[in-house]
């Protein structure tokens, strides 16, 4: 399965801080198709650790409410890829970022990358930039399978979205 190239370099200090999930995409839309879907999570913050690992703070739907979770992402030899243990996903990687406005972040299971791939367009504000949205669409094209984008999350009143 052909997964697009991740960023060659990722400056953790530059991606640190608050983010908003403005668009999501998945190789299997059932991973995202409802508020309770397993990988429909809203990333709030990225926090680098002194060891160059990454703490991902997110919110997800749980029992008709919303729960905050932390995922510990362990650095790998690739500066833009991290090992995680979250549901069936074991890898998180950055596809692209300009650090100031957007970050495209994906999660996958290395054993079945074409079946459980989920990506997010994260923005520093809740505003969707159409140029960046188009860039997100293009970044997803080389992904395996038919990756579908969940419609504009910023217009949805979801309990876990901040």
UniProtKB/Swiss-Prot annotation:
Tissue note: Synthesized in mammary gland and secreted in milk.
Cytoplasm found in the keyword field: no
PROSITE patterns associated with the record: LIPOCALIN (PS00213)
Any Gene Ontology CC annotation: extracellular region
Disulphide bonds in the chain: 66-160, 106-119
A Pfam entry, by short name: Lipocalin
Compartment(s) of residence: Secreted
Entry keywords, A to Z: Disulfide bond, Milk protein, Retinol-binding, Secreted, Transport
InterPro entries found in the cross-reference section: Blactoglobulin, Calycin, Lipocalin, Lipocalin_CS, Lipocln_cytosolic_FA-bd_dom
Gene3D superfamilies from the UniProt entry: 2.40.128.20
UniProt superkingdom: Eukaryota
Gene Ontology MF terms in the entry: retinol binding
Role noted for this protein: Primary component of whey, it binds retinol and is probably involved in the transport of that molecule.
PANTHER family in alphabetical order: GLYCODELIN, LIPOCALIN
Record-stated family: Belongs to the calycin superfamily. Lipocalin family.
Complex formation: Monomer.
Name by which UniProt lists this protein: Beta-lactoglobulin-1
Species for this entry: Equus asinus (Donkey)
Gene (name only): LGB1
């Amino acid at each position: 399965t052909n997964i697009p190239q991740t960023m060659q370099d990722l400056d953790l200090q530059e991606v640190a801080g608050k983010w908003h999930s403005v668009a999501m995409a998945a190789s299997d839309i059932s991973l995202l198709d409802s508020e309770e879907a397993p990988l429909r999570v809203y990333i709030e913050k990225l926090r680098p650790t002194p060891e160059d690992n990454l703490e991902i703070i997110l919110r997800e739907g749980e029992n008709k409410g919303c729960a905050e979770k932390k995922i510990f992402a362990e650095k790998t030899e690739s500066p833009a890829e991290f090992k995680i243990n979250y549901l069936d996903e074991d890898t998180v990687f950055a596809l692209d970022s300009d650090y100031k406005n957007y970050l495209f972040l994906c999660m996958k299971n290395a054993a079945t990358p074409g079946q459980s791939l989920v990506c997010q367009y994260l923005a520093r504000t809740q505003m969707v930039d159409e140029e960046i949205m188009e860039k997100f669409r293009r970044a997803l094209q080389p992904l395996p399978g038919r990756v579908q984008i969940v419609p504009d999350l910023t217009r949805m009143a979801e309990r876990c979205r901040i």
